[in-house]
């Protein structure tokens, strides 16, 4: 279906389904899913709440403590690293950052300091398995960037969702080669669109608009097309 819609980028659904625990997990329901997507030219990423190619449903089954960077950094780091290992050399858009337990805000005195450490650790993991490929983040994904001279390196994205925008406004910024993904709130409300200086980043920018059953008032597909054209 994605190819028929002329798309080549997917975030597998993060929510639990009605199938038995742990629910649908793109990466493990069929271990060949990632390779099949790569064979068809589909770039696999994960939602704003699921960094480094790991699914929320996977963490829920680990029994390795809370999803909390301050209290459980070792286990969370190991979980993320296993996602990078599993992705291998398949074309992947690695999600950076993290939110708190249950896709809520990080519960800490200074989330910005925590996320700075998260970024640092995630970049170290990516460098461990991909070397200097993470030094550039340009691609012809969706036909947006097609400069033949552009260095096509590892793809990384940080999604600026809900309270994360306040961290960004406070000065939190990932490396320049990381794509900034601006997004709505599931209900079609977006805080703002990228500015000119943001579009000049080597990692580029993106905009995510929701269309799904979680928020029934989300924009219809035809509205999304009009917004994309504009």
Please state what every model-predicted region is:
Residues 1-66, 88, 157-161, 172-188, ...:
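Feature activates predominantly on carbohydrate-active enzymes
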């Amino acid at each position: 279906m994605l190819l028929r819609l002329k798309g080549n980028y997917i975030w597998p659904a993060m929510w639990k389904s009605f199938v038995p625990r742990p629910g649908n997990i793109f990466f493990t329901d069929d271990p060949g899913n990632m390779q099949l997507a790569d064979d068809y030219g589909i770039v696999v990423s994960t939602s704003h709440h699921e960094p480094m190619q790991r699914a929320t449903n996977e963490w829920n089954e680990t029994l390795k403590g809370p999803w909390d960077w301050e209290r459980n950094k070792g286990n969370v780091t190991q979980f993320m690293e296993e996602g990078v290992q599993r992705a291998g050399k398949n074309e992947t858009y690695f999600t950076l950052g993290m939110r708190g337990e249950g896709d809520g805000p990080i519960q800490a005195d200074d989330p910005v300091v925590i996320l700075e450490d998260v970024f640092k650790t995630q970049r170290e993991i990516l460098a461990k398995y991909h070397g200097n490929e993470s030094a550039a983040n340009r691609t012809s994904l969706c036909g947006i960037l097609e400069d033949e001279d552009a260095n096509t390196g590892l793809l990384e994205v940080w999604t600026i969702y809900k309270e994360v925008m306040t961290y960004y406004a406070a000065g939190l910024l990932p490396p320049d080669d990381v794509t900034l993904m601006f997004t709505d709130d599931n209900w079609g409300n977006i805080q703002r669109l990228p500015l000119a200086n943001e579009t000049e980043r080597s990692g580029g920018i993106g905009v995510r608009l929701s269309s799904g059953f979680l928020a029934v008032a989300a924009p219809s597909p035809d509205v999304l097309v009009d917004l994309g054209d504009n």
